């Protein structure tokens, strides 16, 4: 895709912001080496003072999986295992035994700022994603949603909460979405009424691709600074 790498982008943002939460929406987790990714994300978390929120998804483009040598049919089970592996590395577990990744006597550094690691959000709109949100994640993220599709997703998550045993150390699932329609104050309130905790807005910066670095940085940071005022939420 035309998107720049998420971890590199977060490192840039960590250096240019002080209080902004930093997240990925989303890293295609089964395409990554979880041991390497654990170090990369923990490094961003440390450099940002604990502001990282890690967003993961399973992916949906078979050609991408062919290119990295990962069977497309394994993307779900790999995602489930890799989330467990990331948490184990961030906790400091010295061993892990899985179908796709294992280690013994390995200690990962740096450790994230929080002993429990950064919050993990899972993205997607499938029954498996809703189960994963309940059993493994701290939050769910919906991209290009409508009010109707968000209501359906939140209801599916609530049903899974009733049917499954959510780990006792997990707090309430945080609901985040990127709406597909133009955002205004009324739409914000309607998403809030549904039970959404956070709206994540998207700005396409491809129009700045040929500009000098200072101009690109200004475009990104101006968008971040102006967004609350644009929504009428300042």
State the predicted function of each range.
Residues 1-234:
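Active-site-adjacent structural elements that line small-molecule/cofactor binding pockets in enzymes
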